[in-house]
Amino acid sequence: MKTVLIAGAGQLGSRHLQGVKTSKHELDIWVYDLSEDSLAVAEERYNQVESDNKTAHFVNSLDLVPAELDVVIVASSSKPRYTIVSQLLSTHSVKYLVLEKFLFPKLSDYSEIDELLKKKGVMTWVNCPRRMWEGYEYIKSLIVPELPVEYTFEGGEWGMCCNTIHFVDIFMALNGAASFEFCIDDLEQEVVDSKRPGYVEIHGTERFTTANGSVLRLTSTTAFDGVSRSIIKNGNNIIEYFEGKGEIVVNGELKNVPVHYQSGLSGILIDELLEKGSCRLANYEQSASYHVAYLSKIAPFINTIKGWTSESCPIT
């Protein structure tokens, strides 16, 4: 029996838990959170999924978790993630680690965690799951690698700070470049409170460019009243992806694809890790480089507007 830990039993963590329960493997599942209320919700959601080869434990201390763990998913918000990972790896042996985004709100955390992961020999990935979506795998098959990718997404209150890294990740997966330049000239000079207490959000347009000529444009505006969709141009192809409806339109021709939720992906992720020793997500080194490039510009932008002097930036 393999042992899995989910650290963080909030909304996302409980969906990870439901997904993990669908794994084909016999699993001993541990769920850790300081909040008894979150643990109760997670247990309720766990019981909504049927499986006859899983056991589950809900605990409020890492001291109660087995010392040797096959897979760990850290699904907390960004602020406590550094502490959770540091504490966990100082007391437990972890084979495979999956971290939720936004990884960390403080730039120095990235190199420190990188050193710790290398020291402990922990294989680590970051959960930007669009790489696992059937729709994006189909789009990837249409991409001509020698030609640039132009990716545009516009929407209303879609949580730009929180979710930009998802789009950056799949954009980089599609265009094949190693790094990007990030332009914030068209962001609105206002910082608003996030839906999640203690975090912030922004509006406007972000622009990312790569050395191979690819461009990603992301726009979030309170005035938007259209249908959100991704528009991807490459060579002769114009691709529209309506993620929420599971519809992809390629040069006017419709293709239906599944709509993916985390509860439908985490079991697949566990199976890939246990059976292959790898998965389709970006590894820590890749994703951390995207995070650092983004945070290096967005943190000073936000902190200047807010009048903060901290080197940290509350995005999650």
Which sequence ranges carry the predicted segments?
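Rossmann-like dinucleotide-binding domain that binds NAD(P)(H)
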Residues: 151-225, 285-289
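N-terminal Rossmann-like dinucleotide-binding module
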Residues: 1-51
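NAD(P)-dinucleotide binding in Rossmann-like oxidoreductases
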Residues: 196-201, 208-273, 278-285
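A short helix-to-beta-strand connector/capping loop
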Residues: 48-57, 119-122
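Beta-strand-loop-alpha-helix segment that lines the small-molecule cofactor/substrate pocket
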Residues: 71-74, 78, 82-131
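Rossmann-like NAD(P)H-binding beta-loop-alpha module
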Residues: 134-150
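C-terminal helix-rich "cap/oligomerization" subdomain common to oxidoreductases
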Residues: 26, 71-76, 272-316
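Short acidic low-complexity segments
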Residues: 52-68
